[in-house]
Amino acid sequence: MSAKNKSNNKTLAENRKARHDYFIEESMEAGIQLVGTEVKSIRAGKSNLKDSYGEIINGEIFIRNMHISPYEKGNIFNRDPLRDRKLLLHKKEIARLLGYTAQQGYTIVPLSLYLKNGRVKVNLAVAKGKKNYDKRDSMLEKAAKRDIERQMKERFR
């Protein structure tokens, strides 16, 4: 396989709960500012996006509550696992996110961490929280779609 056909994206962590708890309005890619031991820990799969969210402070966007376990061989160079990490976006993109989050009920949620050309990237989403009845509706829709697919598969055998 040639280098052009090979995908350079490798998912390292995924926030599956976000798709269940939120309506995803828009998503975008952002870089993340990390130290060396954090990159090594993320590459080892020791990161968690479960309760993390994005917040805009003084025109900069930070990701909060993203847990990156300390690197085992990192000794004194390890940082706090839950520290705020700066996301790297253009000012126009931050302004667009600020416009969304100024509206009632919208938040910034990380969907996944992945490697792109050797750099760690975050897939961010602007999302609106789901109510319990919305979650039930989406689960029923998924089940109905799965049943239809199963019946179609059996019919065309």
Swiss-Prot record:
InterPro entries documented for this protein: SmpB, SsrA-bd_prot, SsrA-bd_prot_CS
Gene Ontology CC terms, in alphabetical order: cytosol
Keywords: Cytoplasm, RNA-binding
Gene Ontology process terms (BP): trans-translation
Cross-referenced Gene3D superfamilies: 2.40.280.10
GO molecular function: RNA binding
Subcellular localization: Cytoplasm
Main location (coarse class): cytoplasm
HAMAP family in alphabetical order: SmpB (MF_00023)
Biological role: Required for rescue of stalled ribosomes mediated by trans-translation. Binds to transfer-messenger RNA (tmRNA), required for stable association of tmRNA with ribosomes. tmRNA and SmpB together mimic tRNA shape, replacing the anticodon stem-loop with SmpB. tmRNA is encoded by the ssrA gene; the 2 termini fold to resemble tRNA(Ala) and it encodes a 'tag peptide', a short internal open reading frame. During trans-translation Ala-aminoacylated tmRNA acts like a tRNA, entering the A-site of stalled ribosomes, displacing the stalled mRNA.
Family matches, as NCBIfam families: PRK05422.1, smpB
Protein name in UniProt: SsrA-binding protein
Lineage: Bacteria, Bacillati, Bacillota, Clostridia, Eubacteriales
Gene name per UniProt: smpB
